[in-house]
Regions:
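Conserved D-loop-proximal element of ABC-family nucleotide-binding domains
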Residues: 78-80
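Conserved catalytic/switch belt of AAA+ P-loop NTPases
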Residues: 82-103
Length: 180
């Protein structure tokens, strides 16, 4: 997905470089490509939001500003971590409050969420059998709260594809970007 996005303008590229520098990541040139953050589903709310006791550490939300925040296996994230997305999605900024300081960082990102229909991944899949009790399915999908779902503009159900089908698509990111 980030390969489809346009290059960053000067102001956004500078913001991205500043946030990377704050996060302790190397900044040798002003990158024009949008950032892409894909935290692991075990990431805590602090890993998403950021923090630090003495030195500010931008989290994945701020590091994705100007680009894409991809949450794969979103149903596996804690509800607390997912709820941390609500305020930045609404306001376009992230506020970090710690003893002795308050920081406001940009948080204008495209959120892409992928999740299975249930913990085993087979619910509703033709030819597969779901082994999950209905309570487990409700609990799993319940981690995506109503207020968070309200901030997701496009919802798309997909069927499984084989590795051969995925590779056979034949459209490069560059070609798709030209069409966009």
């Amino acid at each position: 997905l980030p390969g489809l996005l346009p290059d960053l303008d000067d102001e956004t590229a500078l913001q991205v470089a500043s946030i990377r520098s704050l996060a302790g990541l190397p900044v040798t040139t002003l990158r024009r490509r949008p950032p892409f953050e894909a935290p692991h589903h075990t990431a805590s709310a602090v890993a998403l939001v950021g923090g630090g006791s003495r030195i500010l550490q931008p989290g994945a939300i701020a590091r994705a500003s100007g680009g894409v925040l991809f949450l794969d296996e979103a149903g596996e994230f804690s509800g607390h971590a997912l709820d941390a997305l609500r305020q930045p999605l609404e306001s376009g900024r992230i506020e970090i409050h710690r003893v002795g300081f308050r920081a406001v960082l940009p948080a204008r990102f495209q959120l892409v969420v992928a999740t299975n229909p249930c913990p085993c991944g087979n619910y509703g899949i033709p030819g597969d059998v779901c082994s999950c009790p209905s309570l487990a399915i409700r609990r799993y999908l319940g981690r995506l709260s109503g207020p968070l779902i309200d901030r997701i503009d496009i919802e798309l159900g997909l069927q499984r594809v084989s590795a051969t089908q995925a590779v056979g698509a034949g459209v490069t990111s560059a070609a798709a970007r030209e069409r966009v």
